[in-house]
A protein has these predicted regions:
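Non-globular, low-confidence helical/coil segments that flank catalytic cores
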Residues: 1-283
Length: 283
């Protein structure tokens, strides 16, 4: 387990799930989120790694699980968590998925599990964000209804922002997706807006008490892939507003593989620390 603790504010934990991914987020209000939940090198990851952590921090509910994409090493424990939620007092309130034009048998099975557990599903695309107290979670990828080359290309890219802390999580996004992110971010870097004039994000989701969850407002996209707008920027600090990819901590793409986390992305992100979630003999 790798723990990033901001005293009294925000805890981010990268769980040791071997060749897989699971990042836990706990706000100062003790609201808990997960980004992915899976492994291909460890069996029963939910039972032996994720659920014990949830019990350790004493959570009463998981406000949401962000599934960057549905490869096994990112979702293998989701079914376990849903079953545990049905039989325990810890409820999973929502699951977030990338809003892409790609469906396959694995996704259909996952959606069926979610439906049977009576958990709501929200689809995210670039430009949308949610607020939970002081924590802002921005979606930077994919653009709405993207037709991805494969599951990796469908990956959610999330940016956590609270005060002067930012964390970028890129799922298994590879070079073509990173190139798109960099292209969208460059206008904000090359022509930064003055403080106080940052462009507002088009929609927001505020976390409400149990039973009062607000539906995610969406802005339909009518642009083609080649005509997508630059990523809007409205984080909490001026430096972040000038560069939507700038981060304190970067969760390396595709478990640190050579076809991800390229120099162009690193040049814009300029992380102080890079984390890699992987197992033995990772390539």
């Amino acid at each position: 387990i790798f723990l990033i603790r901001l005293p009294g504010e925000l805890n981010v934990t990268m769980l040791d799930v071997g060749q897989g991914e699971c990042v836990g987020i706990e706000t100062r209000e003790h609201h808990v989120y997960l980004v992915d939940a899976g492994s291909t090198s460890k069996k029963k990851t939910g039972q032996y790694q994720i659920i014990p952590w949830l019990k350790y921090i004493g959570t009463r509910s998981v406000e949401g699980i962000f599934i960057t994409h549905w490869d096994e090493d990112h979702i293998s424990a989701v079914g376990e968590l849903l079953e545990w939620s049905k039989s325990s007092r810890v409820k999973i309130r929502r699951i977030f998925l990338p809003d892409v034009a790609l469906k396959d048998e694995v996704l259909e099975t996952l959606l069926q599990q979610i439906e049977e557990a009576e958990v709501s599903v929200e689809y995210l695309s670039a430009g949308e964000h949610m607020t939970d107290g002081a924590l802002q979670i921005y979606c930077l990828h994919p653009y709405a209804k993207k037709v991805p080359e494969d599951r990796n290309d469908a990956s959610l890219v999330l940016r956590l922002s609270q005060g002067d802390f930012q964390m970028l999580l890129t799922g298994d996004l590879e070079k073509s997706g990173e190139d798109w992110l960099v292209e969208q971010a460059r206008p904000a870097v090359e022509q930064p807006q003055p403080a106080g004039q940052e462009q507002a994000l088009p929609c927001a989701l505020s976390t409400q008490p149990a039973g009062q969850e607000q539906a995610l407002s969406r802005v339909p996209s009518t642009q083609s892939a080649a005509q997508e707008q630059a990523l809007p920027c409205a984080p909490s600090t001026q430096s972040a507003a000038q560069n939507p990819l700038r981060c304190t901590i970067l969760d390396a793409g595709h478990h640190g593989a050579s076809n991800a986390t390229g120099e162009a992305l690193l040049d814009l992100a300029q992380p102080e620390l890079v984390l890699i979630s992987c197992g033995k003999n990772n390539r």
